[in-house]
Regions:
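Amphipathic, Lys/Arg-enriched alpha-helical "gate/interface" segment within cytosolic domains
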Residues: 1-131
Length: 131
């Protein structure tokens, strides 16, 4: 598998759509993965919501805790809310466990449409938010 992340930012909705395709085995893999995110996020220039497709994201168990720590740090300032989606049961289980360890949201939706609806609900529930 080629390690990459595909980004598509909907500026009017302030939603970053990502397609994660990465086999994360080492701390170096985690750092490289989040460096891709940091590079793209630096081009956005505003706080945003994110919908992530996780079917091709593999996080090996022995690196999951470090992944969670870095994920929390990497997104704490700019991310307004996150909804993940995927159909692959192994990817869903692995990411849910990792998110729980990192004390991050761990809901994973079955489709992109469900994830977008979850973001819209988060937007509506955010006090004073027009985002």
């Amino acid at each position: 598998m080629d390690n990459r992340v595909m980004f598509d930012y909907d500026r009017s909705a302030k939603i970053l759509f990502v397609e994660d395709q990465w086999d994360i085995r080492t701390t170096q893999d985690v750092d490289a993965f989040f460096a891709e995110y940091a590079h793209f996020i630096s081009t956005i220039g505003e706080k945003f919501w994110m919908v992530a497709h996780i079917d091709k994201l593999v996080i090996h168990a022995d690196i999951a805790e470090y992944y969670g720590e870095v994920a929390r740090e990497a997104t704490s300032e700019r991310l307004l809310g996150l909804a993940r989606w995927g159909e692959d049961s192994v990817a869903r289980m692995t990411l849910r466990t990792t998110a729980m360890k990192a004390k991050m949201p761990f809901d994973i939706y079955s489709s992109r449409e469900e994830a977008v609806r979850a973001i819209e609900k988060m937007k509506a529930e955010r006090p004073g938010s027009k985002a």
